[in-house]
Each structure stands twice: as C-alpha cells, then as structure tokens.
Curated annotation (Swiss-Prot):
Record-linked HAMAP family: MutS
Protein name as catalogued: DNA mismatch repair protein MutS
Pfam family, one: MutS_I
Region annotated Disordered, chain positions: 1-26, 865-892
Keywords, in A-Z order: ATP-binding, DNA damage, DNA repair, DNA-binding, Nucleotide-binding
Disulphide linkage map: none
NCBIfam families assigned: mutS1 (TIGR01070), PRK05399.1 (NF003810)
Function per UniProt: This protein is involved in the repair of mismatches in DNA. It is possible that it carries out the mismatch recognition step. This protein has a weak ATPase activity.
InterPro entries linked: DNA_mismatch_repair_MutS, DNA_mismatch_repair_MutS-lik_N, DNA_mismatch_repair_MutS/MSH, DNA_mismatch_repair_MutS_C, DNA_mismatch_repair_MutS_clamp, DNA_mismatch_repair_MutS_core, DNA_mismatch_repair_MutS_N, DNA_mismatch_repair_MutS_sf
The keyword Metal-binding is annotated on this UniProt entry: no
Keyword GTP-binding: no
Top-level taxonomic group: Archaea
C-alpha cells in the first residue's frame, strides 16, 4: 500500500542487518512518531526475534530494515514513506495473497509476526487497534496453505541434565510438538544419542536449552534443514516448565523426568507464544512418552544411504513413496512414523502381521476401505483448527464429510472380522475405537449450510430451521426484498414509465431510476438520490423504510449467525479428545490397509519372526523392482554373528543387494509384508550402514575421514542383534592401508561384536579371511565374460548372487561399458598385463571357500538361482551391451613400464566411481609423470 508521499527506491542486492526487532531509526525518534508508526514500533519491540508484517488496510507493511528484506525476499517494490518525522522505507504485500510471500520469508529463515487490525475501521474514529495475533515460524506453521503436504511439522526442544562436566555421563531429553495437530511426544536420550534421535524426528525448528553446548548440535551438521531458535531461557527452568505442563497434564512429575519436563515445558511455552500468547493449547490433550530402545534404531547415516525418505537422485524414488498406498493424510503420517520407528517387540510385530493378513485375505473389502478412507479429510488438523477457533464453516462441512464415512468403514471392518479365521486383535480394537460421533455429525448437519461461504461473517452459514430467532429475522429480510422486487412492476403501472427500474448499490442503497426523457412523469413523492448522464435516481419514503428494515435485518442476521457459528464451533471443540482418538484410529487403519494393498498388488509375503536366523528367499528390492522392467531376485541365509563377504564388479548390484536386505528387515519390523518368496527375520535392535554412492557414477563419494567416523560409530555401538552393511571399507586411502583397515574391521566385528554383517570389497585377497573366521563366508555376483574373435572381451552382469568369491573386479570391462574412450580402456589393459597375472588372481583358498558354507546357506543361494534359472545366453540376450566407444582421443604409449609408481597409481584407480572429467584429468596427470 502506498500514499501520495510514497516513492520507489532501489532495494539493493544485499540484505541489511537485523531486519527483526525495532528499527533503530524509529527508536531514536520515538516521541515524534505518528500513532500508527508507534504501534509498529511497539510490535517490533515486543517480538525482537521476528520480522513484523503490519496490517494497513488490505496490505501487510514492513518498514526500515524489514522493508528492504521484504522487498528483496518477496520481490516486491521498495518505497519510501515521508511524514513530519522523516522518511522511512516501506514495502508491502497484499493480504489476500500473503501466503506465498510468508512462505518465501520462512524459506529465507525469518520468523514472521503478523500484526493485524483487531477492530473494524468503521468502529472507531481514531487509530485502529492492532496486535500481533500469530508468529509464523518453520516449526509452528498452522495455516493450511503453508502446510503443503500431509507430513508432520515438528517443533523440537533439547534439554540436558546437570552433570559434573563429563559429556559421556550426561543424559538429556527431546520433546516435539506438531502445532498443526497437537501431537506431543518426549523421550530421554543419552548425550551421544541426541544427534541420532533428532535426525530421525527431523524437527523444522529446534529450541536449545541454555545448558546445551550449541556446538554439539549445530544445525549445519544435521542431515536436514532446521531453524535453531534461542527461546526465553526461563521457559527451560524446571519450576517454570513444570508449571506450564500442569495446564496440560495432571501431576507431570509422576511420569516425566526433570529433563523431560524442561524440554516439554519449553516447547509448549514457545508454541503458546507463537499462537499469540493465547494460553494453553487445548488441543494438545495428551503428551506421549516413549523410549528409544523399544524400536529398531536406524541412524541418520542409514536413513540417508537407504533412501528411506529422501532420494539422493533428483527424481529418485524412496522407500516410503514406493510402499505408500494410504488414502488420507492421517494414514500417510502414521505410515511414516512406523517406518521411522519400526517395532522391536516380537508380539507387537506379529499382531500387526495378523491385521495385515486378515485384510489381505479380502481384496474387495480392501478396495472398499481404500475408497471410503479417501473421503476422510485431515481430521487432526481440522480438530486443531477448531480448537484454535480458526475453523470456518467449510471446515465444519469437511469434518462432517469425514465423520459420515465412519459407519461404512466400521461395516467393512466387521466384514473382515467375520470372514477371517486369523487373530485380529488390532482390527477389533480399531473397530471399537471408531466412534461414529453421531452427536457431532447431527449438530453440524443441522446447523451449517451445505455450501457455506469461506468467510463466516458473510452470512448464509447457518442452516434454515436451526434457530427460530434467526429464521424470523431472515423472513423479515426476505419479505422486505420481495416487496422491493415487486416495486418496479407497481411503479411502472402507476407512473406509466415503462423504462423505470429499481436497483441497489453499496454506496447509495435502493433507488428508482428514470431516464431523462421521462422525468416529467416523475411523481412528487420521489426524492432525487443521484444524477447520471442519461437518467436520475430517486427514492421514496416507503422505499427508504424498507431499505432500513432490510439492512437492519441483514446485520442482525449476520451477527446472530456468527454468534451461533462460534457456539457450534465451541461445542465441536469440546469433543477434541474424541475427535483425536478417531483420527488416530483412522491413521492406523489407513496404514494397515496400505500394507495390505501393497502386499496384494506386489506379491509381498508374511515374514516369520525368528530368534536368530535371517533367511530371505528370492528377495526383491522394493523400490528397484518397480522401476525396472526385469529384476533378478536374490536371497540370503545367515545366522547371528555371520559375515557375508561379497565380491563382484561395480555396477553388478552389490549395493542394491545390501539395501534390499535392509529394506526387507525394516519393512518386516514395521509390520509390513515383504518382497520375497519367503522370509525369516530376527528382531534387530539397530541397522548400521557404511554405503557410498548408489550403483551409478553420478553419485557423490564420502571422504576417508567421513568413512572412518562412521565406522567408529558402528564399531562402538553395534551389538550382536544389529545388522551391519559395509560397502568397500578402506577405499578412500591407499591400497595397503585400505586393505589392512578392511581386514581388521572384519575381524573385529567377527570376534568382538558378533553382528550379522554384509561386507562388500574389491580387495580380493580379503576373501581369504573366511579361512580363519568360522562365521564368515563368501558370496559373489555372477558375470558372463565373452571373448570375441578380435580378442576383445565384453562382460554382461547377471545380477545373480552365488556362493564363493569373484575371480575379478572386471574394472576395465565396467569402464568400457560405461563409455570410457577406447584408448583409455586399452592402455589400462596394458598396465594390468605389465603388472602380471597377480593383479587379477586371488588365492585358491578365497576362491573355493564356499565349500565351507553351511548347507542352509548353499541351499538358500542355490535355490534363489534356480528360481530365476535361465541360460547365460538368455540372460545376455536380454542385457544391454556396452556403448560404442570413442576412438578420437590419442594417448602417449611410450615407456609404459618405465615408472612403476605410475603403474601402481593406475592400479589403485576405481574407474567406475570416476566422472569422465576426473578420468581425463587423471590420465593427463599420468602422462605428465611418464614424460618427466
């Protein structure tokens, strides 16, 4: 919004410092400011950590430094406001379209305080009162337009108990609240688990207790985006936090530790602050305390490398996207929470399997449930908006539509329970929890119009017949409008003016319009109201009385409708706990139906939970099998403490195979069926991964220090109940050092930890450790190598796991398949021949150690191969051949054996993990060293 004294100015390119807080220029002229700017300054001082958007008419305005920020971030015009006290920069955004601008400010890491006009301009002759009604931050978003998807948005808080300075002995607590739904949770964690738990929860905003060293929780080091907030330190004080909690739960000291009380108290205090200091958030009706050791723990590294929720590729699929067949936002959030915290209790897992199995037995009912669940709106967020007094009439109708689906959902569940012979404790419980909420349904259905306007103050919100007084007022209003509509006919007949018209404008009200040629026929009782170019507008005493009656009735009706709607909304809000219970049940049912749907459509099988054995028969990668036309299943069988040494070329599928096993274990413990012909899964306590980029050369590669840091975490924290996936440990350093580190790692895991481990390596002599480690065995990926008449060779990856160690890494052949120029490939082959046969050979002990596999292991691997039995020629016919090579590049071939260091450097190169540019740079470096 601009005034006659506003002028455009250049916003510049750099953000000015401190756009939040009171502008220095206004502080120095406080006594001279206009009343409106004084209001703005007061809002800025009250919220120094936020950028204030100040309502002026139909715009939100910002001034001084904040104006520059708004202009640059939101790409709007920066102007100047001049008054008697000076010149102030200003920038504004239209209120009707403010959401996109607020989203841009949030993305730029600003908190936004909304200062609204809290009284109508017509209601006062002086300055309109304004107040900050909402502070929007990344972790406290409640606006439906800013909540872009069904995912939970968490505000988190971290507190740590007092200690004697020994960080290893410190314990802390992490609390989260989803302000949009009211879900609040807290857990205690060891000091070294804080990072891991935060990575699992992924709060959008994080409050740090004053006793926490922020260096230990730097947002830049977390594997997700979060805003780190320093809130009022007093909110973390135990007494203050306990007092805050007492408004939510009875006797918080009875079930929450001091660290937990401090974390929950602080997070709720901040949530209240951002909602306009409205007091306790009534819809936060329950605080759930959980333990981290009651779930399968998947740390941040594993979450990333397994691509559970985020893909490393720009358009890659994730595990949750692949298995998500939910129909509602409630189900999607539940499904994600189950994947983030898979079960670690045998009976709980089995109970969830029973529910999925009972549903999967009846595909038609599953289809019915899917269709009915699709009519369920986001009940949690609707309930929260209702409790915050932000729900409008359309929200009420959405709530009604959701509740109307519940009886049919209950009927479908009863059909499943009637027909199944399986234990169905979970489904029985859900059926009982699905309260039809008939009282709320009846209230909304009889009270709120079926197609109400967006704004509840616009009228036509309350249904006819709900309130007698409102109906009487509406009848008087309607009678007045009918009288006016009949007036035109009567006056035409009475005056003889056929062109006479009766109309209405917001400014002048009702009028009788007569064209200029007929003005001589205007009756004396007509009073002129407005003169137009070709006509005059009049009113009569009777018309004016009717107009006053209609306006008065309309205003009374609108006021009464708003009062009635607020009463209805409050009555619904009083049932928040019942609505939340139904929402929770719907979410769990939707997630179970999703599991059943994926099991039916993709032939997933029910796993068997075992004590020790991990056996997968013809397992499939759940993501890859849906993105590739042909997928070769592979299985594995190994007991607690067994280590599978996996060899084979790059691109053969080793990393995919390891991720496949991890995905199957995670799905199994989440309660889902799994992609395999059969599966026996033990209850794991943790999954660790040290996996580099995915099986193409477009992925990034971790530094050696990162690799060793991750290995340190694994070796310190893994137990015999863990699953460890290690991909080419030691590749980031010299061959000698890398081989030594890899071997020592395998021996330590075997002798000291005893965890089930999958270990891929290109150090072929490392496969000989199976001779000295009784629980280690070799697996490799089969490759078909064909020599052509011109002595050229090609390889085809069969993607099939079999026992024993690979006879070569086929690095040069992989480079050729990847399209590396022919001169580079040929020269690499010469270097290999120069080094001798020992470059590719491995010891007989490593090659033939598969004789030492247990019978079960050999049966598992061989059975999977038989399941996919086809001749190598058939496999080759279906597999892509290498790309045509580029023969334009030249290369210096002189003195190839003159410098043994150059040859060793070439041998250590992992070509398949190099980009074309890196390969050419390395080749240039080798040439230069030879020339020297």
């Amino acid at each position: 919004m601009t005034t006659d004294t506003d002028t455009d100015v250049d916003a510049g390119t750099d953000l000015e410092p401190q756009p939040e807080g009171p502008p220095e220029k206004m502080l120095t002229r406080r006594t001279e400011l206009t009343p409106m700017l004084s209001q703005y300054l007061d809002c800025c001082e009250a919220h120094p950590d936020a950028l204030v958007l100040f309502q002026v008419g139909d715009f939100y305005e910002a001034f001084c430094e904040a104006a520059t920020t708004v202009a640059q971030v939101c790409e709007v015009t920066l102007t100047q406001r001049e008054d008697s006290t000076g010149t102030y920069r200003m920038a504004g955004v239209p209120i009707d379209n403010a959401t996109s601008y607020i989203e841009a400010l949030l993305s730029a890491d600003f908190r936004v305080a909304i200062a609204e006009q809290v009284e109508e301009a017509e209601a006062t002759s002086g300055l309109v009162d304004r107040a900050v009604t909402n502070i929007i931050t990344p972790g406290t978003v409640t606006n439906g337009d800013l909540l872009t998807d069904a995912a939970a948005t968490y505000l988190g808080a971290v507190s740590i108990t007092d200690s004697d300075g020994d960080a290893s002995e410190m314990t802390g607590a992490i609390a989260t609240v989803d302000v949009s739904t009211g879900a609040c949770r807290v857990t205690s964690v060891e000091h070294d688990q804080i990072y891991e738990e935060l990575s699992r929860l992924r709060p959008a905003e994080l409050l740090i207790g004053p006793e926490v060293d922020t260096k230990t929780i730097e947002s830049s080091s977390l594997p997700f985006e979060t805003m780190q907030t320093t809130h009022n330190s007093g909110a973390f004080e135990l007494a203050t936090a306990t007092q805050t909690l007492e408004a939510y739960v009875d006797e918080p000291t009875a079930f929450l530790s001091s660290a937990e009380r401090r974390a929950v108290g602080a997070v709720l205090d901040y949530a209240e602050y951002t909602q306009g200091d409205c007091g306790p958030l009534e819809y936060v009706s329950r605080i759930r305390r959980y333990k981290t050791d009651t779930a399968l723990r998947v740390d941040a590294t594993a979450i990333q490398s397994l691509e559970l929720f985020d893909s490393r590729q720009p358009y890659g699929e994730t595990l949750i996207e692949t298995i998500d067949e939910t129909s509602s936002a409630l189900g999607r959030r539940t499904l994600e929470s189950w994947l983030r915290r898979p079960l670690a209790d045998h009976e709980a897992i089995k109970t969830r399997y029973d529910a999925v199995a009972a549903l999967a037995e009846n595909p038609l009912v599953v289809e019915t449930l899917t269709e009915k669940l699709s009519h369920i709106y986001d009940l949690e967020r609707l309930t929260a908006r209702t409790a915050r007094e932000q729900a409008d009439a359309r929200d009420m109708r959405s709530l009604l539509q959701s509740l109307d689906s519940i009886p049919e959902i209950k009927s479908a569940l009863i059909e499943v329970l009637t027909e199944t012979e399986l234990p169905a404790e979970t489904l029985e419980q859900l059926q009982a929890e699905l309260d039809s909420l008939d009282d709320i349904r009846t209230l909304i259905d009889t009270a709120v119009c079926s197609d109400p306007p967006q704004t509840v103050t616009d009228g036509d919100v309350i249904a006819k017949g709900f309130n007698d007084d409102l109906d009487d007022i509406r009848e008087r209003e309607e009678a007045g409008r009918e009288w006016v509509s009949e007036l035109e006919t009567r006056e035409r007949e009475r005056t003889g003016i056929d062109s006479l018209e009766v109309g209405y404008t917001e400014v002048h009200g009702y009028y009788i319009e007569v064209t200029n040629p007929n003005l001589d026929h205007v009756p004396d009782e007509y009073t002129r109201r407005q003169t137009l170019k070709n006509a005059e507008r009049f009113y009569t005493p009777a018309l004016k009385r009717r107009e006053d009656e209609i306006i008065a009735a309309s205003n009374r009706a609108d006021k009464l409708e708003y009062e009635l709607f607020c009463d209805i909304r409050a009555e619904v809000a009083a049932e928040t706990s019942r609505l939340q219970a139904v929402a929770d049940a719907i979410g769990r049912l939707d997630a179970l139906v999703s599991f059943a749907t994926i099991a039916i459509s993709h032939a997933y099988v029910r796993p068997e939970i075992t004590a020790d054995t991990l056996a997968i028969e013809a397992g499939r990668h759940p993501v890859v099998e849906q993105t590739q036309a042909e997928f070769v299943p592979n299985g594995i069988t190994f007991e607690k403490g067994h280590i599978a040494m996996i060899t084979g070329p790059n691109m053969s599928g080793k990393s995919t195979y390891m991720r496949q096993i991890a995905h199957i274990c995670i799905l199994a413990q989440a309660g889902s069926f799994v992609p395999a012909d059969a599966a026996q899964i033990p209850v794991l306590d943790r999954i660790f991964t040290r996996i580099g980029a995915s099986d193409d050369i477009s992925g990034g590669e971790s530094t050696f220090m990162r690799e060793m840091s991750e290995m340190t975490d694994i070796l310190h924290n893994a137990t015999e109940s863990s699953l460890i996936l290690l991909d080419e440990v030691g590749r980031g350093t010299s061959t000698t050092d890398g081989r030594a580190i890899a071997r020592a790692t395998v021996e330590f895991i075997h002798n000291e930890i005893g965890a089930r481990t999958l270990f891929t390596t290109h150090y072929h002599d490392l496969t000989t450790v199976t001779g000295s480690l009784p629980s280690a065995f070799n697996l490799h990926f089969k490759v078909h190598r064909k020599t052509h008449p011109d002595n050229d060779a090609s390889v085809t990856f069969l993607h099939r796991v079999t026992s024993g160690a690979a006879d070569s890494s086929y690095g040069v052949e992989v480079a050729k398949l990847a399209g590396v120029p022919t001169p580079v490939v040929e020269q690499a082959q010469r270097y290999i021949h120069t080094e001798g046969e020992d470059y590719t050979e491995i010891s007989e002990q490593g090659t033939h150690h598969h004789d030492e596999l247990t019978h079960a292991e050999m049966v598992s691997v061989d059975h999977d191969n038989q399941q996919n039995q086809a001749s190598d020629d058939d496999e080759i016919a279906r597999s892509p051949r290498g790309a045509d090579t580029n023969t334009d590049a030249g290369i210096n071939q002189s003195d190839v054996s003159a410098n043994i260091d150059v040859l060793k450097s070439l041998r250590d190169i992992d070509i398949a993990r190099m980009t074309p540019l890196e390969a050419l740079n390395m080749l240039e470096n080798l040439q230069r060293r030879l020339d020297e």
